[in-house]
């Protein structure tokens, strides 16, 4: 799937200047691929940056669609509903709680169940802990951009706050981003920023 929408700098002459690190890819951009997999060019034309002074040069992204999902990684971070991560003490592994019950998509552990345990180290992922309902949770680091999982894990080992989970990476993360990129780096459950979003589902009856 190539680099996806992950290879733009966060600068006044690139992503920051273009739209202040908000999403780049229009919804449904790769719908022509249906439920299949493919890559489509997205061209950002040269324009004046938001500061009115700098120029944003033309940039071409390779937008991936994987089995019907646009941008399975990149563009912006995806915040996952129904996940709360808890670390009892600094530098210890974290417990990952999940649920598929929409009434439990809250900012507390509540009735969520333990899906697995997250390693207390940042780095390229070497192994996953696999949950009973297909959760993949980094259990070891020590890989690289070309070995093992090839995606990055952030966790902020000193944080003991309840944390949310972001996955995928955004438009400036390059080789750190990917399908398995896992970021619980101390961002509390109420974290919000321009480069973080979520996926929605439309049920057609």
Where are these regions (language model features)?
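Functional-site microenvironments in short loops/helix caps that host divalent-cation chemistry
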Residues: 1-119
């Amino acid at each position: 799937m190539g680099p996806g929408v992950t290879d733009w700098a966060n600068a006044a002459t690139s992503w920051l200047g273009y739209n202040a690190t908000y999403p780049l890819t229009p919804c449904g951009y790769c719908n022509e691929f249906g439920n299949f997999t493919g890559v489509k060019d997205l061209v950002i034309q040269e324009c004046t940056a938001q500061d009115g002074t700098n120029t944003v040069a033309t940039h071409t992204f390779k937008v991936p669609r994987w089995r019907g999902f646009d941008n399975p990684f990149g563009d912006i971070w995806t915040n996952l509903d129904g996940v709360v991560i808890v670390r009892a003490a600094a530098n210890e592994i974290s417990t990952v709680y999940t649920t598929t019950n929409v009434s439990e998509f809250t900012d507390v552990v509540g009735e969520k169940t333990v899906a697995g345990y997250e390693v207390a180290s940042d780095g390229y992922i070497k192994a996953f802990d696999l949950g009973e309902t297909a959760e993949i949770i980094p259990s070891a680091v020590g890989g690289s951009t070309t070995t093992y999982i090839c995606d990055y894990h952030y966790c902020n080992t000193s944080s003991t706050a309840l944390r949310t989970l972001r996955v995928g990476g955004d438009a400036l993360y390059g080789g750190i981003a990917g399908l398995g990129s896992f970021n619980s780096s101390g961002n509390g459950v109420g974290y919000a920023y321009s480069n973080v979003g979520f996926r929605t589902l439309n049920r057609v009856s």
